[in-house]
Amino acid sequence: MSKAHKPWPYRRRSQFSSRKYLKKEMNSFQQQPPPFGTVPPQMMFPPNWQGAEKDAAFLAKDFNFLTLNNQPPPGNRSQPRAMGPENNLYSQYEQKVRPCIDLIDSLRALGVEQDLALPAIAVIGDQSSGKSSVLEALSGVALPRGSGIVTRCPLVLKLKKQPCEAWAGRISYRNTELELQDPGQVEKEIHKAQNVMAGNGRGISHELISLEITSPEVPDLTIIDLPGITRVAVDNQPRDIGLQIKALIKKYIQRQQTINLVVVPCNVDIATTEALSMAHEVDPEGDRTIGILTKPDLMDRGTEKSVMNVVRNLTYPLKKGYMIVKCRGQQEITNRLSLAEATKKEITFFQTHPYFRVLLEEGSATVPRLAERLTTELIMHIQKSLPLLEGQIRESHQKATEELRRCGADIPSQEADKMFFLIEKIKMFNQDIEKLVEGEEVVRENETRLYNKIREDFKNWVGILATNTQKVKNIIHEEVEKYEKQYRGKELLGFVNYKTFEIIVHQYIQQLVEPALSMLQKAMEIIQQAFINVAKKHFGEFFNLNQTVQSTIEDIKVKHTAKAENMIQLQFRMEQMVFCQDQIYSVVLKKVREEIFNPLGTPSQNMKLNSHFPSNESSVSSFTEIGIHLNAYFLETSKRLANQIPFIIQYFMLRENGDSLQKAMMQILQEKNRYSWLLQEQSETATKRRILKERIYRLTQARHALCQFSSKEIH
């Protein structure tokens, strides 16, 4: 028989038998004799699990009395019993199993599920699929029943087995917590809780109701019951109630930490079941889905083999397989058949059924066996999820702590404390401004330091100067021809009129003023934005203080931009005075001459002058000479301006601007009567800080719980 067509119990055994850690933990129990109980002998341990091939995934045969026996222990349950073999075995069971479930329940009680997903079992099913009956059989209490949507809020059902204690219950929702003394109170209190959470109509809510039951007759298990899937809105239900319910169900079942328990009646076509379809959508491989078949007594005669194929995992394969149960029917509920009697009738039904009794022997049938299976699945799932959960809690804690740090500390209530608080805020702001000015600010991976942003504009400025020099070279012949025709006086042929040289220099120096002022404007905007970003970082949560600082930044920017602009204008006015030190100019002039003329003394192609030469020889001589001088002078002028203009911008817009801003910030401290106004915090910031503190508290408690659990496991 191929692996794909093996009966499910055999596939299950081979799948789980490799889990050495569970087998190791259970070894201490497997050698003890089975306790006396009311469970039929064939249910104490399925024949095909005997010997060395026993299924390590289940809790060993000696645990069966803990989960399968729904009869109350002999004697008064409220009185402690002597520590016999049964109690000793339960004590060992308690040490291994209960802490796992208690750990997750405690994390859920802390509200950790608001921050990350916890291991859980979620029960889903279509309306009238028998979902409520299964949960009633597991919990031993009556849950809300009726037509339409009965479960209107997610219900966390925490079952705790305590052999020596009387029944006790507790229901919690929102700010309400109520102790229950009798199982009969459960249905009424759940109805009341749902009306509080979802209103008195037929709407639904995503808020959780927690129901904790402690009893000797329940398994150790925590299950989340979700609303039944509906397709048509009735009465006063919202028109999109079906979509709302599906969205709520999907919110839970899509989590990788959730085992999906899909309840399907035997008398429907499994391929058309909405619940199984939703589970398949979020778990295509069936790794975390268990199918539960209900109502085997209502199926049509002749369809038994098809149900057998489903349970044996041959029709719609799931890696965790299927189980089949028979719960109380409506008539039995009306006749007040107890859950204990219902369990006996269920066992008798499967024992005497010609087709299904083999499923009983294989451990795939009855509610008690389902309880054992679910407890084991949940424990395995918790143990598997703990390393990932620990990492997620640590990461979420770090992230929340960092967010809280960015929100800043709480604002003091005392005026004296407010002064120190404001001093510290301004001190940190000034330090960051100083780092910007010095080019030492801390940047993230994809960010750029302020100096590098400005430097890009400075590089463009060098390009502008080079372009301007080239323009001079290109128009020399036009200027010389104009001189020859209009302005030449008594000077001899070949002599250059110095006035012509000055006119050309003045003309092209003036063309550089606008690009220089444009560069100043761009640099100013970059620097101002950097200062504003620092202000938002430190004062963003204080609207009045942030506005005050940004207004100060704007005022100082205007002041120093005007100073820088005046200095640039002054620089260019000075450049109108044609000047260069003789020793510097002579060196540059010599270098240009060497580049212009080759050793034979003929014009070189480097200046590309040939195409611009006038026809007469005097023009050639004048053109070449003035070209050499202009080229030499503009080379030296470009060097001077390439550094001088950036110097002016850096000095006024960074150094002076930053210093003035830091001094102005200290002036704010003199206005003591404005402290409270300046430190008025935005309401969303206070809310965010409170939420983050609550999250950090939850996650801290969760880490503490995990550490305690780990230390107990080690010891």
UniProtKB/Swiss-Prot annotation:
Pfam families cross-referenced by the UniProt entry: Dynamin_M, Dynamin_N, GED
GED domain ranges (all copies): 623-714
Any single GO BP term: regulation of cell cycle
Functional note: Interferon-induced dynamin-like GTPase with potent antiviral activity against human immunodeficiency virus type 1 (HIV-1). Acts by targeting the viral capsid and affects the nuclear uptake and/or stability of the HIV-1 replication complex and the subsequent chromosomal integration of the proviral DNA. Exhibits antiviral activity also against simian immunodeficiency virus (SIV-mnd). May play a role in regulating nucleocytoplasmic transport and cell-cycle progression.
Domain of life: Eukaryota
UniProt cross-references to InterPro entries, sorted A to Z: Dynamin, Dynamin_GTPase, Dynamin_GTPase_CS, Dynamin_N, Dynamin_stalk, G_DYNAMIN_dom, GED, GED_dom
Keyword Transit peptide in record: no
Protein name: Interferon-induced GTP-binding protein Mx2
G4 motif: annotated span: 294-297
Gene this chain is encoded by: MX2
Positions of the UniProt region annotated as G5 motif: 326-329
Coiled-coil zones: none
Species annotation: Homo sapiens (Human)
